[in-house]
């Protein structure tokens, strides 16, 4: 199956474990059942090591469930062509990667055909446009390897904007605003609520 109809997600009695090099299992998720409607903005809260990242990584099949089912648009994720599924599930992690090149070129890794207007709009939603405009060369500012010339919070916002340009059915932000201040985090969240 190649077409992902919408962004609805359901976890149906999902169990997940990691197996270490000795073959010992560490149970991370047990009997998780959850339904998320397409367009819904939710937060998953829990302490460090509680399985939040593991849970969301089951959606694009970075891992597979041990028991139960993860469904997207009503179909088990295992029924989708893996590449097609992953093109419709954008993930922005706490640790983000920027590439050498301009900001605009980095944004086009999310969508090669993105117009300048689409790039600016995505950056506005991600609260990146303001700091980009402060650079002498704006969107033509060169990014050093790994994004060494921007702060951690700026790097996170650029990666969120790049993910938005993919126009995915599902956008997962996994601790991806950890390096931004509370005000900026709230602004990003409010822009997502407006967009959805």
PLM-predicted stretches and their roles:
Residues 2-196:
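ABC-type nucleotide-binding domain
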């Amino acid at each position: 199956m190649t077409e992902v109809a919408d962004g609805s997600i359901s976890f149906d009695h999902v169990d997940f474990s990691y197996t270490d090099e000795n073959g010992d299992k560490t149970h991370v998720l047990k009997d998780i059942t959850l339904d998320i409607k397409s367009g819904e903005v939710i937060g998953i809260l829990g302490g460090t090591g509680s399985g939040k990242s593991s849970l969301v990584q089951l959606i694009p099949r970075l891992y597979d469930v041990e028991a139960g089912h993860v469904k997207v648009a009503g179909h088990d994720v295992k029924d989708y062509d893996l590449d097609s599924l992953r093109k419709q599930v954008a993930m922005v992690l706490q640790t983000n990667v920027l590439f050498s090149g301009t900001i605009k070129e980095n944004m086009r890794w999310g969508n090669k055909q993105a117009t300048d207007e689409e790039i600016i709009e995505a950056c506005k939603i991600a609260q990146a446009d303001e700091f980009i405009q402060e650079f002498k060369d704006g969107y033509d500012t060169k990014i050093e390897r790994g994004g060494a010339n921007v702060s951690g919070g700026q790097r996170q916002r650029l990666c969120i904007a790049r993910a938005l340009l993919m126009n995915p059915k599902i956008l997962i932000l996994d601790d991806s605003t950890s390096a931004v201040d509370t005000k900026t985090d709230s602004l990003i969240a409010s822009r997502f609520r407006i967009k959805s």
